Each structure stands twice: as C-alpha cells, then as structure tokens.
C-alpha cells in the first residue's frame, strides 16, 4: 500500500518554506514578512508577475476557497505565467500565509470564481479578495481508508477527517488548528486593511447577481457556485463565532468582599487601651510566687524514718 498523503504534508510544507520551490521548479523569494497575531504573512516574489492584473479593482469582499491539493502544487497552479487565475493568499496546514498578489484595496486582482459564478466572474473576482486554504476537500470512504478526488489514499485514521454532509459528500479533510487560527487572523486583518465589514454569508446561495455584487463581507466559493464544494458551513462557521465572541464585553472581575468590622468609637478604643495598660501595670506590681526547690529523694526517706523512730520511743 502506498503511503497516505496526510503523512507527507508536513514535510512538503516545511520543505517549501525552506527552499521556496514549487512543483514546477520555480523558486520564489520572500519580499516581505508581516506579523498578524500569532500568524505571519510571507509575500512571495518572482520575476514573472504575469499571473494577475494590476488594473483598478476596489476590494469590498473576501472569498474563501480550498485548493484540493498540497502547497507546492497549489503555488505552482496559482502563479502559472499569463494564466490570470490566482488568489491573494494561500494558507497551509502549518499556518503559514503566502501572499501571491500584492494587497491594494483599489487595484491588483485575478480571476478566481469561474464562469458560472453568481454575480459574474469579472465583477466578483475584482471585488473579492481570494483566500485559498491548502486542503484536499471532499473525501470518499473505502475499506482501507479515505480517498481524495484524484482517487489517492488521503488518510487511514478518522482523526484527519470531518464527518460533514455537504453536496453529496459525507467526509471532508480536517483543517489543522494552526490553519484555522491563521485564516481567522487573516480575515480580520483584511477587514481592517480594506474597510470590509464583518458580514458573513457562509451558507446558502446568493439569490441573484445583484445580491452577490452588492454584498460586502465574507463568503465562500460555494455561495456563488452550486457545483463547488468549498467550503461546508461546518468548516468555516468558527470564523463568525470567534468574531462574535470577541465583541462580547469581558466578564466583570470578582473583587474580594471587604472584611466586616464592628463599628467602634474613638472613646471606646481609648477605654480599651487604658484597660489593657492598667492590667499590665497590676501584673507587674505583684510579687512573684516563690519557686519550690526540689530536694534529693533520700532526704524525704530519712525524714520518714526519723519520724517513725520518734513514735516508737514515745
């Protein structure tokens, strides 16, 4: 049996971060690193920047995708020269965030929603910042494990899978905690950078083109494409829940109750002090009780014998 893909992913991601080489052999450089919360954004740079447009495109939305692949292939596909199909960010399982298209809320974009997109691909791809989550997506369960869309063994253990019924699939690849944290922090950071409100459309389709185009906030690919599987609501609802939780007021700090003391006047305090002082003086004037000296044991016996002889004589 071939090794399960899940067992190779951490090594692939660690190797890519070290040598920055995609599956086509193209090597990148890290032009800039931006720290956001616990996560970091790495701006990947290569001489060929022909995979995106630099024309005007005002950002009002964020769209979440998953790649159905692993990081080296994901980067290669999304930076294919002249293809103009890409996204701004890719988040791997280790929580690394790679920036492919320079962020500018007024320009820089690439197609990422497809021809069947509600709202039209041209309009929505310009207004929506794309985030790809490096993840294999829907899985099929077999006797020996779970298989991906390419009919490859993804994993054997259930812990790598989420049991989610969504669009005719029952199982989906589980996101790592580091990945979930990075996606959440990236979404919040982008909302701040581009003045995008925290409105969430994470389930159900947009009714029509107008609704999709006028929406401002965060949605997933599945909200504009009925033929897509990225992403099930159960996998992304945590983003909305964590944001709403962050808005709650902090719980009040419980302070220790003050120690209750009886009310006492100054006159009473003075009286008690004087009483204590008098008692001390009285004790000092008393003569000490003489200490009885211990006598040797034989002295007492001799005294008893002497007394006995005295009685006999009498």
Region roles according to the model:
Residues 290-314:
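Membrane- and interface-active hydrophobic/amphipathic segments that mediate membrane binding, fusion
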Residues 78, 239-243, 305:
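Generic structural signal of hydrophobic/aromatic residues within well-ordered alpha-helices
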Residues 1-27, 32, 55-56, 137-284, ...:
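Basic/polar, cationic surfaces and motifs that engage anionic cell-wall
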Residues 50, 248, 302-303:
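Intrinsically disordered, low-complexity regulatory segments enriched
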Residues 29-192, 196:
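Active-site-adjacent loop/helix surface patches within enzyme catalytic domains
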Residues 42, 106, 240, 294-295:
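Intrinsically disordered regions, especially transient/low-confidence alpha-helical propensity segments
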């Amino acid at each position: 049996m071939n090794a399960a893909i899940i067992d190779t992913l951490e090594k692939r991601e660690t190797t890519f971060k070290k040598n920055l080489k995609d599956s086509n052999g193209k090597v990148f450089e890290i032009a800039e690193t931006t720290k956001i919360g616990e996560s970091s954004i790495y701006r990947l740079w290569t001489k060929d920047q022909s995979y995106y447009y630099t024309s005007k495109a005002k950002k009002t939305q964020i769209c979440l995708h998953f790649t159905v692949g692993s990081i080296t292939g994901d980067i290669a596909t999304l930076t294919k020269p002249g293809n103009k199909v890409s996204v701004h960010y890719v988040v791997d399982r280790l929580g690394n965030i790679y920036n492919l298209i320079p962020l500018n809320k007024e320009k820089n974009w690439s197609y990422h929603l497809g021809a069947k997109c509600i709202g039209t691909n041209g309009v929505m791809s310009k207004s929506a910042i794309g985030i790809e989550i490096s993840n294999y997506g829907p899985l099929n369960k077999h006797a020996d494990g779970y298989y991906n869309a390419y009919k490859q063994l993804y994993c054997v253990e259930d812990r790598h899978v989420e049991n989610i019924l969504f669009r005719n699939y029952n199982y989906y690849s589980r996101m790592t905690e580091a990945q979930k944290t990075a996606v959440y922090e990236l979404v919040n950071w982008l909302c701040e950078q581009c003045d995008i409100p925290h409105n969430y459309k994470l389930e159900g389709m947009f009714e029509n083109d107008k609704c999709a185009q006028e929406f401002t906030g965060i949605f997933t690919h599945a909200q504009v494409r009925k033929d897509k599987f990225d992403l099930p609501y159960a996998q992304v609802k945590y983003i909305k829940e964590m944001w709403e939780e962050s808005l709650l007021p902090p719980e009040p700090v419980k302070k220790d109750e003050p120690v209750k003391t009886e009310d006492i006047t100054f006159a009473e305090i003075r009286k008690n002090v004087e009483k204590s002082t008098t008692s001390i003086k009285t004790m000092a004037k008393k003569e000490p009780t003489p200490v009885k000296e211990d006598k040797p044991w034989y002295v007492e016996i001799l005294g008893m014998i002497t007394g006995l002889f005295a009685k006999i004589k009498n």
